[in-house]
Amino acid sequence: MKKIVLLRHGESAWNKENRFTGWTDVDLTEKGVAEAEKAGVTLREYGFNFDKAYTSYLKRAVKTLNCVLDKMNLDWIPVEKSWRLNEKHYGDLQGLNKAETAEKYGEEQVLIWRRSYDIAPNPLSESDLRNPRFDYRYHEVSDAELPRTESLKDTIDRIMPYWESDIFPALKDAHTLLVVAHGNSLRGIIKHLKHISDEDIIKLNLPTAVPYVFEFDENLNVANDYFLGNPEEIRKLMEAVANQGKKK
């Protein structure tokens, strides 16, 4: 049975500080590295091998992938990076503490910014140095395609062309693929694969560095999906993600 494993990056510095990260290129914490290495060990122990891996342009995802492949002795497999797998762009919220923002604007407003389907935060200005137009890694991406902010819908609209043109077609000639990305970019893929409604997708909270496996039948329809790990531990990790946008 063919498989695609989705993996959110390990804890980043701004995950630890409970900040809106988006396209800001922050590194993994020591805990994040350990989480990524644990994911690699878990995948190896469950007998997984990957034919190809995909990740974003952001170092927290790239380094997570490197840790996983190292622990699996799969450093040699082909890896494809795409800006389309980047996290949702949080606009002018990037860098702000989520709990402090909830104190200022209310938990409901922060939940809307974090989890609503089609409402985006305020955009970055054209002169803001956080604007991706100033980042050389995106010099081959047209200015019209680079976001200044995004809703989850915008994020999915960015990701799905790449999913449809590159990742999913590769499954025809491969047995197992690995996608290491971000909470919201992976949420978009999961929404597509499981046909989750716009209303229900905002309730999905992905923990860091816990492998999420999708199995496909001979017609490449989803046959099964599951997390690898202790169900109770995973439930607690999901609750922790859900609580990030609440007041202190």
UniProtKB/Swiss-Prot annotation:
Keywords recorded for this protein, A-Z: Gluconeogenesis, Glycolysis, Isomerase
CDD domains in alphabetical order: HP_PGM_like (cd07067)
EC number from the UniProt entry: 5.4.2.11
Pathway stated in the Swiss-Prot or TrEMBL entry: Carbohydrate degradation; glycolysis; pyruvate from D-glyceraldehyde 3-phosphate: step 3/5
Parts forming coiled coils: none
Active-site residues per Swiss-Prot or TrEMBL entry: 9 (tele-phosphohistidine intermediate), 87 (proton donor/acceptor)
Catalytic reactions of this protein: (2R)-2-phosphoglycerate = (2R)-3-phosphoglycerate
InterPro entries attached to this UniProt entry: His_Pase_superF_clade-1 (IPR013078), His_PPase_superfam (IPR029033), PG/BPGM_mutase_AS (IPR001345), Phosphogly_mut1 (IPR005952)
Sites annotated Transition state stabilizer: 182
Gene Ontology annotations of biological process type: gluconeogenesis; glycolytic process
Pfam families reported for this sequence: His_Phos_1 (PF00300)
Residues the entry annotates as binding substrate: 8-15, 21-22, 60, 87-90, 98, 114-115, 183-184
Organism domain of life: Bacteria
Family statement drawn from the similarity comment of this UniProt entry: Belongs to the phosphoglycerate mutase family. BPG-dependent PGAM subfamily.
General function of this protein: Catalyzes the interconversion of 2-phosphoglycerate and 3-phosphoglycerate.
HAMAP family per record: PGAM_GpmA
The protein, known as: 2,3-bisphosphoglycerate-dependent phosphoglycerate mutase 2
Gene: gpmA2
